[in-house]
Amino acid sequence: MTWQQRITTALEKRRATDAFRVRTVVEGGAGRFLIRDQCQFCNFSSNDYLGLSQHPAIVRAWQDGAERYGVGSGGSGHVSGYTTAHHALEESLADWLGYSRALLFISGFAANQALIAALMEKDDRIVADRLSHASLLEAANLSPAQLRRFAHNDASQLNTLLEKPCDGQQLVVTEGVFSMDGDSAPLGDVQATAQRHSAWLLVDDAHGIGVLGDEGRGSAFSQHVQPEVLVVTFGKGFGVSGAAVLCSDSVADYLLQFARHLIYSTSMPPAQAVALQAALKVIRSDDGEQRRQTLAALIQRFRAGVRDLPYQTTDSHSAIQPLIVGENSRALTLAEQLRERNMWVTAIRPPTVPAGTARLRLTLTAAHQTQDIDNVLEALYAAG
């Protein structure tokens, strides 16, 4: 099979199963509304959970940072790209989350890949929740370590897998809030199980940080857990982009030596770090708390409203509210029916989710209003 035949075959297979992905050009895709072809849609696909991407103080901070530092960092943090803005943000994050150190990464995907690649050796074992993010599972598959996956949120099966003989070290991997189902990991049980076997715990809290817990400290803090390694990302609750790894001094020093994604990547623009510092200030403020309360009320209203819909829901009390419809074609049809009513909802299909669990993945944000929730519920019942 030639290169072109291989590519053509793969694309034809995706099209035949209604799993072909396309991008849509829009304007204002992070806000309450987005524009496509001069039409306005109420946006239920954004991860901007607290509505901070449009926050005037954060926008101004990025502008001020660009005035001071320029628009790029100019290099890796190991060369010339580690500025006072980067250092200050790392210090603030570590203090906020109760860790010795924080290291900035350009994305959550890069952070997860770097961590697992740097930490794991061939005699080691990774035991990951079956629904962990693609960045974690891909990194685990590419690493020299053995990968075993436990049933979703099943600490008992996790214990069984950790009991099996292992010549090296064991790393337990999970998420704080799961990106496709929106439910939370029982981090207390998971950590206790890991500790019983001297395993380390890595938690990716991309969808919990900024949104859950006191001052938005996230899933681990709200469940009174401190994993050995915590990954937080800035494209959701923070409304910006990028990521950080929280860890001990020794792990941070180790990653600075061996995390190739960190060493060989241009660091995030200093202006972005300035904006993230401003976002953190908002998250920790009364404004941030009010946004979290607003979001929680909207989530409660939505969940109460979907009870009689003929779709499967999950045990999600987060901003991620999936409606599982089963077939790919059904999910696509529903998404299109909602867009005809000016509601922007995304259909999620395999391989992103397991076969037979295609869904509408609605995300709620503090920028939404009560009427938006009522409108999308009315549209869902009309389409149902």
Curated annotation (Swiss-Prot):
MF term (GO), any: 8-amino-7-oxononanoate synthase activity
Catalysed conversion reaction: 6-carboxyhexanoyl-[ACP] + L-alanine + H(+) = (8S)-8-amino-7-oxononanoate + holo-[ACP] + CO2
Keyword flag Lipid metabolism: no
Disulfide bonds: none
Cofactor(s) this protein cannot do without: pyridoxal 5'-phosphate
Pathway: Cofactor biosynthesis; biotin biosynthesis
Modified residues (N6-(pyridoxal phosphate)lysine): 236
First-level EC class: transferase
Sites where the protein binds pyridoxal 5'-phosphate: 108-109, 179, 207, 233
UniProt keyword list: Biotin biosynthesis, Pyridoxal phosphate, Transferase
GO biological process, one term: biotin biosynthetic process
Quaternary structure and interacting proteins, as annotated: Homodimer.
Family per record: Belongs to the class-II pyridoxal-phosphate-dependent aminotransferase family. BioF subfamily.
Cited NCBIfam families: bioF (TIGR00858)
Protein name listed in UniProt: 8-amino-7-oxononanoate synthase
Source organism: Enterobacter sp. (strain 638)
Lineage, opening ranks: Bacteria, Pseudomonadati, Pseudomonadota, Gammaproteobacteria, Enterobacterales
Underlying gene: bioF
